[in-house]
């Protein structure tokens, strides 16, 4: 399986316009927290960077099975936290994709690991992960915290073939 587009958009042009809404984060265990986001701009623009055009009409599955209003999530990872390797669910005919924006990065760690490969990202970088088909995790955070904004969508498998070689 191979991605046919750049995985990371360095210093994404809309990064400084994205903010996590005020409010309380929910505990997700082991120093990981999340907060639903009820409204956000630049959802379409985030996926367009990767030649994807998701439809909001397909967001019902994500709404019921995940944490986000329209499935936008603010994630806050504390010192020592990491994301364990996993693959997320998706309906049979779709791929669950996430365009993640690094809002704050610790001095050490916090990089995504996708398909066993560490991906170097910096603050304001946007990266793509096909979370229902690519095993993914992150490196442990040391000396700070990691804050990301995660845009979620379902993309039909036939549309994913334009950017990813499916087996």
Predicted regions, residues:
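Intrinsically disordered, low-complexity segments enriched in polar/charged small residues
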Residues: 37-38, 91, 151
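Catalytic core of non-heme Fe(II) oxygenases with the double-stranded beta-helix
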Residues: 59-132
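Intrinsic-disorder/low-complexity, polar/charged segments enriched in Ser/Thr/Lys/Arg/Asp/Glu/Gln
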Residues: 3-4, 96-98, 148
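Catalytic core of Fe(II)/2-oxoglutarate
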Residues: 105-167
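Surface-exposed beta-strand edges and flanking loops
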Residues: 5-7, 22, 54, 75-79, ...
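Non-heme Fe(II)/2-oxoglutarate
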Residues: 1-69
């Amino acid at each position: 399986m191979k991605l046919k587009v750049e995985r990371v958009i360095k210093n994404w042009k809309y990064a400084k316009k994205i903010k996590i809404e005020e409010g309380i984060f929910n505990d997700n265990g082991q120093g990981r927290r999340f907060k639903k986001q009820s409204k956000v701009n630049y959802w379409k623009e985030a996926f367009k960077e990767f030649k994807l055009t998701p439809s909001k009409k397909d967001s019902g599955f994500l709404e019921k099975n995940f944490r986000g209003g329209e499935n936008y999530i603010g994630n806050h990872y504390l010192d020592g936290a990491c994301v364990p390797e996993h693959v997320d669910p998706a309906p049979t005919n779709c791929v669950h994709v996430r365009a993640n924006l690094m809002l704050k990065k610790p001095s050490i760690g916090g990089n995504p690991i996708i398909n066993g490969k560490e991906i170097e990202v910096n603050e304001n970088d946007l990266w793509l992960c096909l979370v229902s088909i690519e095993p993914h995790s992150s490196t442990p955070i040391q000396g700070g915290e990691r804050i990301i904004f995660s845009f979620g969508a379902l993309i039909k498998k036939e549309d994913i073939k334009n950017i990813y070689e499916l087996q």
